[in-house]
């Protein structure tokens, strides 16, 4: 038991990269996310989450919790239910408008091929950085397969 606690302390709290962060497709900084929620700083938690995932409400609902599979806590009482924490950040934050920055337009055009969620997230990130983005989709609707 002490060996497991040391492993959790080292890889989740202190020294090593947390396995949950590397298993998350968005690399959400869980070490920062959870303490913000513990302090009930939902707006700060939401901002961190939104900066990682681009579409926070959608991702909070469809998250497959890949982090649970690698969480060392699963062996001593259960993995952290990050999906519920994501939903809490989305639900209880009262400032969810995108941040606005006064950046000058880049003057460059970018084409994004496909309108699945990953392509739309890419287009959103580029547009936020003031690129002129055009999304091309061969189907009549967006959202991917």
Where are these regions (language model features)?
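Ferredoxin-type iron-sulfur electron-transfer modules and their immediate structural context
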Residues: 1-109
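Glycine-rich FAD pyrophosphate-binding loop
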Residues: 131-145
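Residue-level detector of alpha-helix initiation sites
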Residues: 54, 116-117, 141
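N-terminal Rossmann-like FAD-binding beta1-loop-alpha1 element of flavoenzymes
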Residues: 108-135
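Generic detector of intrinsically disordered, low-complexity, polar/charged segments
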Residues: 104, 111-113, 140-141
């Amino acid at each position: 038991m002490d060996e497991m606690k040391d492993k959790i302390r080292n890889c989740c709290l202190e020294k090593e990269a947390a396995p949950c962060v590397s298993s998350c497709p968005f690399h959400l900084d869980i070490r920062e996310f959870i303490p913000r929620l513990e302090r009930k700083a939902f707006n700060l938690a939401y901002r961190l989450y939104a900066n990682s995932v681009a579409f926070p409400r959608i991702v909070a609902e469809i998250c497959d919790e890949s982090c649970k599979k690698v969480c060392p806590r699963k062996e001593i009482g259960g993995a952290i239910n990050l999906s519920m924490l994501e939903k809490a950040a989305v639900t209880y934050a009262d400032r969810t408008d995108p941040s606005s920055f006064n950046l000058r337009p880049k003057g460059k055009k970018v084409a994004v091929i496909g309108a699945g969620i990953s392509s739309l997230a890419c287009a959103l990130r580029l547009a936020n950085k003031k690129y002129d983005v055009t999304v091309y989709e061969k189907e009549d609707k967006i959202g991917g397969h």
